[in-house]
Amino acid sequence: DHMLPRRRFDHKGRYGHVLMITGGYGKMGAAVLTSKAALRAGSGLVTTHVPRLGYEIMQTALPEAMISLDISDIIFSHPPDLDGFSHVGIGPGLGTKENTQTALETLIKRTKKPVVFDADALNILSLKKELLDELPEGSILTPHPKEFERLTEPVATHFERIELQR
């Protein structure tokens, strides 16, 4: 275990409140896995924003996570209020539908809070590269090599990829 031990009577609120915006039709496993990872990493509280179809899945698979429901039944279409969260992650399982792209753009323009962008959030950023200049300061992008190429430019060799990442 790589976690520092917690004091016996510490309150969960001392360890942050993470918001995960994740999951969609056919991809609710992404919401379960990312929320479990946030808890395992030491978050005191985890809220997962999912489409309505994800409510029962999340409550069954991870009852310790709180749920924030999107107004859509099957996709991320309206960003929740980010106030009250110490950390925000977005992307796994979202898909790249037009409404989801608009919701991500709204979230980016509405917050100054750093956000961790992963998976489909990165795919949307690669489709709307103008948003890269608007990311909140301190935000983190977590691309795998192909996502990185979509965000930047194709490279011929691994060495070129490393040089571009610098």
Predicted region positions:
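Small-residue (G/A/S/T)-rich helix-start motifs and N-terminal tracts that mark the onset
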Residues: 1-119, 123-141, 145-166
